[in-house]
Curated annotation (Swiss-Prot):
ATP binds at residues 100-124, 148-171. Residues 227-229, 352-357 are annotated as: Interaction with NEDD8. Residues 368-463 are annotated as: Interaction with UBE2M core domain. The active site is at 237 (glycyl thioester intermediate). It is an enzyme of class 6 (ligase). It comes from the Eukaryota. The modification N-acetylalanine is found at residue 2. This is NEDD8-activating enzyme E1 catalytic subunit. The gene is UBA3. GO terms for molecular function: ATP binding; identical protein binding; NEDD8 activating enzyme activity; NEDD8 transferase activity; protein heterodimerization activity. Pathway: Protein modification; protein neddylation. Binding of TP53BP2 to the regulatory subunit NAE1 decreases activity.
Amino acid sequence: MADGEEPEKKRRRIEELLAEKMAVDGGCGDTGDWEGRWNHVKKFLERSGPFTHPDFEPSTESLQFLLDTCKVLVIGAGGLGCELLKNLALSGFRQIHVIDMDTIDVSNLNRQFLFRPKDIGRPKAEVAAEFLNDRVPNCNVVPHFNKIQDFNDTFYRQFHIIVCGLDSIIARRWINGMLISLLNYEDGVLDPSSIVPLIDGGTEGFKGNARVILPGMTACIECTLELYPPQVNFPMCTIASMPRLPEHCIEYVRMLQWPKEQPFGEGVPLDGDDPEHIQWIFQKSLERASQYNIRGVTYRLTQGVVKRIIPAVASTNAVIAAVCATEVFKIATSAYIPLNNYLVFNDVDGLYTYTFEAERKENCPACSQLPQNIQFSPSAKLQEVLDYLTNSASLQMKSPAITATLEGKNRTLYLQSVTSIEERTRPNLSKTLKELGLVDGQELAVADVTTPQTVLFKLHFTS
């Protein structure tokens, strides 16, 4: 190529040369696999090394399994989910499903790189799938603009691995319970083929964690529930009478003024994704803050308090997503021993990582298959049982529904989620366990939004 050629001619010539090379190499063809495309993956799968699994035998079959067969479900398409989807798609995983119930907000664009300004208001799952399917040849990402609770066991059973990038503990607990419900036991022995591995990642600011869960074999979410701090709630007396923080003012407007004034019409609930709703809360919070000489109420803080927004840092998402994607790769190929089983990451003051083995809980309400023993006096009221279920660090239920078999009939003692039944069963809360007809050794079945399964409790009376 002559040195005097203009830049445009040089560019065209380079494009022609690249096109010729692609034609010689076979191009993308129908498979979208040009020569050398998967060399970076083959290095891990077609040769052994000091870190490979002792039973691993290098072959071409593992790569073909990734490309043609392995189905992975990614739950969450936010900051962590975008990183996960990108990593998996570029690592050879082609059969990917993604679930997310959220839509794209302008505040997402600084770190959720699969989205653009034109996508604001559209479902995250659909936009992420479109982007990857268009950008990565032969990648088939199937979107689901749904809640995870919208799908049954048949749907989840089809996947080889499930990886989560969630910001909700309730959602984590639900999918954990679903995967445990898929397990099959023969004469008390777990059938390994019924296990769907769960890779869970989470981030908050400059901190993050990743864990590998083999349901029925290793510690599940419920086994280590105490590791999750309870949601911070401000006392109502402080919010109403003695506010000291800007958050107190915002919570006052959210919890008291909104239901009282109903600014957007009777029965219209507060929508944290509606700018008009947030603006109304913001203005009223400013007014209350000025009454008590409190500074710091901003629109961003208002949005964060109303939506319970967790602070996000793009670099933390990238690190944790890389760990999770690596674990998916290790389990899918059996080439390397997976993480055992919990990793924490912290780069607040430097860089710190630590890995440890979380142990299974013998009486775990989710994976132990044992009824949970609870002790109460016969004179204790049902309200005390309800408080125990919601306040216990090892249970942390949100709206438990309690049923029991009395005189051969299944009887609902209390159910909160259905208004008519809640009104009918509310008087039971002030009754003693003895008055309700419960006896020592009675089994109580408790349903809750945190799990798709019913949790069994065995009631023991204390003297």
